């Protein structure tokens, strides 16, 4: 199992999750603080599960282990707000390691799943944070209940960068090539090493 998903991995995962559009969110479980399970159901397909490990990875399954009888406060909040909501959209925020699930019930909600750094889960309605799993404050961003939600500053999307922009980014970095690709372009270590190998470039230059 990979330690964390790269932005490329998130793009692939989002494509897989499109199958759940128009399914209903049946229930939310939180077996541990870092593990959130979304149970989705469809009349024609039965029930399946999205397993989200905060800040690390996400996968879908058709089975899950027995859940704790007493839900956490965060799971209870999500059940109250979005149980039986219809999943109307799944998208990646730019090239970020962020997945946004759009849910409709008594209005439109967004469940934001963050896979970067320590990660987070944030429920948003009409641009206002209902509740985050973890409240945080940065210089450029505040994630707290009843505050306006903002995504982190965007990272470059390599598909939208020309050769000149990539070269400028490389020149401005103090790190070696592989670390620059992994962190500044969010490619992750494995894809950065692969890119250097295919181009015949020393990754540690």
Segments and roles (model prediction):
Residues 2-3, 7, 20, 43-205:
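Phosphate/anion-contacting hairpin/loop surfaces
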Residues 5-41, 45:
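N-terminal-proximal low-complexity accessory segments that begin disordered
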């Amino acid at each position: 199992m990979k330690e964390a998903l790269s932005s490329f991995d998130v793009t692939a995962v989002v494509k897989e999750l499109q199958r759940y559009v128009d399914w209903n969110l049946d229930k939310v479980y939180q077996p541990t603080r870092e593990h959130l399970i979304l149970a989705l159901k469809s009349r024609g397909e039965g029930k399946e599960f999205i397993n989200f490990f905060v800040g690390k990875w996400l996968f879908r399954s058709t089975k899950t282990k027995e859940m704790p009888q007493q839900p956490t406060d965060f799971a209870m909040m999500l059940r109250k707000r979005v149980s039986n909501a219809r999943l109307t959209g799944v998208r990646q925020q730019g090239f970020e390691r962020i997945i946004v699930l759009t849910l409709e019930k008594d209005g439109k909600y967004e469940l934001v799943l963050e896979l970067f750094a320590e990660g987070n889960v944030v429920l948003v309605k009409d641009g206002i944070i209902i509740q985050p799993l973890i409240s945080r404050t940065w210089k450029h961003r505040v994630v707290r209940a009843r505050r306006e939600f903002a995504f982190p500053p965007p990272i470059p999307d390599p598909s939208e960068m020309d050769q000149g922009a990539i070269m400028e980014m490389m020149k401005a970095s103090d790190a070696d090539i592989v670390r620059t690709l992994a962190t500044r372009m969010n490619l992750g270590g494995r894809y950065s090493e692969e890119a250097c190998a295919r181009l015949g470039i020393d990754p540690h230059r």
